[in-house]
Amino acid sequence: SDGDARKCLNALEIAALTTPQGKEGVVCVDLQAAMDSIQKKAVVYDGTGDDHYDTISAFIKSIRGGDPDAAIYWLAKMLHAGEEIRFITRRLVICASEDIGLADSNALVVAQSAAQAVEFIGLPEAQLILAHATLYLATAPKSNSATVAISEASREVQEGRTLAVPDHLRDSHFKGAERLQRGAGYLYPHDHKGAVVPQAYLPEGRRYYTSTEHGQEKRIKERLDFWRRQFEELSARK
């Protein structure tokens, strides 16, 4: 695959693509252009076909798998091949919530900041920003709990298992709401100790979010467990 004939063809293609046209629109490859092109190794990359999707897939999977070296390599390949920067940053922003999520919520801030910064900076310096974001996401703790939660809730809605909003949770900020019992029985959490009060927001047993113990999400799990114990204790006193 790296034979001399192929190398010559690749070098010729690079020379033809990088040499500006002459006055009559003819590309004239001189000795210097030919020598420069021979030193360059073409990146096999179809910007709209399999290479485009396979490389971004390898990039995201490397981040998800916590391999910063692989992630930075696939990023370099895409950049060298001329991949659209916005395509890369969109995937980074999605990955920040899909694969890192609540384990490190700052990952979304980093990814979104990178997306904005590369628009302002442009290449070639934008590759530094992309490398920064890529390495942050690859080395961050991982959680897909947000992905699973919205998928499970969406599945129930799509299957027709929709719920009517209970009266105590309905909007009561309009004239006549009291007469219609809108919001009747709602308990305002901030009026209670610790801003915690037992109250039904969904039918019992419905649960979509399961926190992991990865990164920052471990503290979220501890907080939810604490609240649930409080709910049980307060409910038992009634």
Where are these regions (language model features)?
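Short amphipathic beta-strand starts and helix->beta connectors
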Residues: 194-196
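Terminal-proximal interaction/regulatory segments of ATP-powered molecular machines
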Residues: 65-190, 202-204, 208-238
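Inter-lobe coupling/hinge segments of SF2-like helicase ATPases
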Residues: 23-24, 32, 40-56, 67
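Conserved C-terminal "switch" segment of AAA+ ATPases
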Residues: 2-29, 44-49, 99-106, 119-125
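C-terminal helical "lid" of AAA+/P-loop NTPase domains
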Residues: 6-21, 32-39, 57-61, 72-77, ...
